[in-house]
Amino acid sequence: MQPRLGGPALLLLPPLLLLLLLGAGGGDCGARAEVLFRCPPCTPESLAACKPPPGAAAGPAGDARVPCELVREPGCGCCSVCARLEGERCGVYTPRCGQGLRCYPNPGSELPLRALVHGEGTCEKHGDAEYSASPEQVADNGEEHSEGGQVENHVDGNVNLMGGGGGAGRKPLKFRMKELAVFREKVTEQHRQMGKGGKHHLGLEEPKKLRPPPARTPCQQELDQVLERISTMRLPDERGPLEHLYSLHIPNCDKHGLYNLKQCKMSLNGQRGECWCVNPNTGKLIQGAPTIRGDPECHLFYNEQQGARGVHTQRMQ
């Protein structure tokens, strides 16, 4: 029987989700024996519909002179975009990092994998970041998050659901499941300790009272529901095809937990995902804003909506 990932251990879910969306890059033959999904091939029609990336300049003969490194769109898109450079922000919804770079969370982040969901990672060279250590090294250093938080951000379209790094250092699926089980126990114990309230914690005579966690915003609650839904899937045989996972709408929340004005579906089958505009507080569709495979310029419709509400308020006074 395959183990299940459910219950309070939602912190275990972002590694699986991020590696699905970012597309972990290549590894050795042993790594490819693990659970892999591949993006479907791009059709000639899809490639012909692609436009030059914003960083490309038109040459004298109409050819594009590209001053940036071109990488594939996030998800399973077929068009090219400019890769993120070393030191630039990166994450689930951003273009991939350039060759030789990976997307790492900031070393001081308490929830590194959630930070990558919000695009708060940084493109760095492999081995330069603190999170490039193996799970054992991180555990020996006393780090609380034993998964290490490392996420590859390469471009070959292979998606590894079970790993946070590539190359010969990868471990078999059996060992990773054991590591996930150990981490789940740590999270469960942490929740148990937090539920003790005013009791003495960790043997301290005068422990600080634990503050109740801040209320989850609607966007964060919706994201938690999506992660919970993924957690109830069996690993790995009932994970389902790639198209099924990409059919889930993953809300795009900002660092404050509000909805980003522009929400998009992930690219699939060589087509860009549709984008639409929502109210940052409620996530509801902004009336009159288009749903298109591109930039709907949500700020224009949101400002117009806010202006109309201001006029209505003045008339009521």
Curated annotation (Swiss-Prot):
- Motif Cell attachment site extends across 293-295
How it assembles, according to the record, is: Interacts with IGF1. Interacts with IGF2. Interacts (via RGD motif) with integrin alpha5/ITGA5; this interaction induces cell migration, adhesion or apoptosis according to the context. Interacts with PTPRB; this interaction leads to PTPRB dimerization and inactivation.
This protein's source sits in the domain of life called Eukaryota
Instruction: Please give the coiled-coil regions recorded for this protein.
Output: none
- SMART domains registered for this protein in UniProt: IB, TY
- Keyword Zinc listed? The answer is no
To which species is this protein native? Ovis aries
Q: Name one GO cellular component term.
A: extracellular region
| Key words of the record | Disulfide bond, Glycoprotein, Growth factor binding, Growth regulation, Secreted, Signal
**Free-text tissue specificity from the UniProt record:** Expressed in abundance in selected adult tissues, namely liver, kidney, adrenal, pituitary and choroid plexus.
Tell me which residues make up the IGFBP N-terminal domain: 35-126
Q: What is known of its domains?
A: The C-terminus is required for IGF-binding and growth inhibition.
Q: Which GO terms describe its biological process?
A: positive regulation of activated T cell proliferation; regulation of insulin-like growth factor receptor signaling pathway; response to insulin
Q: Where in the cell is it found?
A: Secreted
Give the intrachain disulfide bonds.
Answer: C39-C76, C42-C78, C50-C79, C68-C82, C90-C103, C97-C123, C219-C253, C264-C275, C277-C298
Query: What is the stated purpose of this protein?
Result: Multifunctional protein that plays a critical role in regulating the availability of IGFs such as IGF1 and IGF2 to their receptors and thereby regulates IGF-mediated cellular processes including proliferation, differentiation, and apoptosis in a cell-type specific manner. Functions coordinately with receptor protein tyrosine phosphatase beta/PTPRB and the IGF1 receptor to regulate IGF1-mediated signaling by stimulating the phosphorylation of PTEN leading to its inactivation and AKT1 activation.
Supply the name of the protein. Answer: Insulin-like growth factor-binding protein 2
- Could you describe the post-translational modifications of this protein? Cleaved by MMP9 leading to release of free IGF2 from IGFBP2-IGF2 complex, which contributes to enhance the motility and the growth of astrocytes. O-glycosylated.
Reply yes or no: does the keyword Hydrolase apply: no
Query: Where does the record place the Thyroglobulin type-1 domain?
Result: 216-298
